[in-house]
């Protein structure tokens, strides 16, 4: 069978780099050919972080950063292809998520905004780009997120196996695969790595808490944890999605102001428990037992995985590598898959997950010609 090569590009809310993957979809399961992470230069990262918070002169900065991010994504593709013997002419399309700078689906006129000009990516790589995956779902009354459950369903579902796929990036989201004719469900549970990363960056100038070691050295404060878990988002019914608009450094500082007596490592431990408890609560509402497979950056945080296991005794806990998909690259592979679905004219959203009025082909195509 002829190879079906697609490239997936993903930069999440944690903004810890652009993940690029080359995937072959000609077989029954996606085959990861090669992968690459392109670091986000510090000046660009600062600009993106500024743009994620309301301020003045946003339109000019948005326009510049849209081009800058497009150039960075193109660089990621070109560097990816230097790692393998696949010519750009053999790649059917690039699926680019872009960089989210606003996700506000619950306004009267909801919207989501990802930047990273696909025209720039297409012209600088010579490969057609499929991008802007989320806004069609929002136009149909949906949340525009999460989009990965459709990929999880096709890749990980098995009759008779009750599974939850947990993606822990900046925000955590779950896909419930019931293993029978019941609906697949999925939604954002709340913060994943975003708050634990923000706190260690603020206090220790380190990009992330490696293996959760700093959190492990602290002790969770139950009063602070209770206050954090009282955020209205956690009691919302699904479909629901969230982002930095709700869970950000400004919100965290506001929550911490009555708790300035706490040691810094105790706050880190509490923030990690916020992630774990909010995930576990939502999982137990769906089912108190099953198979749990974790992907995303959180899969490499040993302390996070240990705490999740303690909160979910009815679940077996693994990463998606046990199902044949590297947890580091799972989301990039999902956006390559979304590009394939667009190319084939197939729907890629799950209305039961996003709340959209119907299934739809997602994304628009930007030609390299």
From Swiss-Prot:
Catalytic activity: 1,6-anhydro-N-acetyl-beta-muramate + ATP + H2O = N-acetyl-D-muramate 6-phosphate + ADP + H(+)
Involved pathway(s): Amino-sugar metabolism; 1,6-anhydro-N-acetylmuramate degradation; Cell wall biogenesis; peptidoglycan recycling
Residues where ATP binds: 12-19
A single GO BP: peptidoglycan turnover
Alphabetical keyword list: ATP-binding, Carbohydrate metabolism, Kinase, Nucleotide-binding, Transferase
Keyword Nucleotidyltransferase assigned: no
Gene transcribed to yield this protein: anmK
PANTHER family the UniProt entry points to: ANHYDRO-N-ACETYLMURAMIC ACID KINASE
Organism phylogeny: Bacteria, Pseudomonadati, Pseudomonadota, Gammaproteobacteria, Alteromonadales
Role played: Catalyzes the specific phosphorylation of 1,6-anhydro-N-acetylmuramic acid (anhMurNAc) with the simultaneous cleavage of the 1,6-anhydro ring, generating MurNAc-6-P. Is required for the utilization of anhMurNAc either imported from the medium or derived from its own cell wall murein, and thus plays a role in cell wall recycling.
Name of this protein: Anhydro-N-acetylmuramic acid kinase
Signal peptide: none
Family as reported in the entry's similarity comment: Belongs to the anhydro-N-acetylmuramic acid kinase family.
Record-level Gene Ontology MF annotations: ATP binding; kinase activity; phosphotransferase activity, alcohol group as acceptor
Disulfide bonds: none
E.C. numbers: 2.7.1.170
Pfam family, one: AnmK
The keyword Nucleotide-binding is assigned to this record: yes
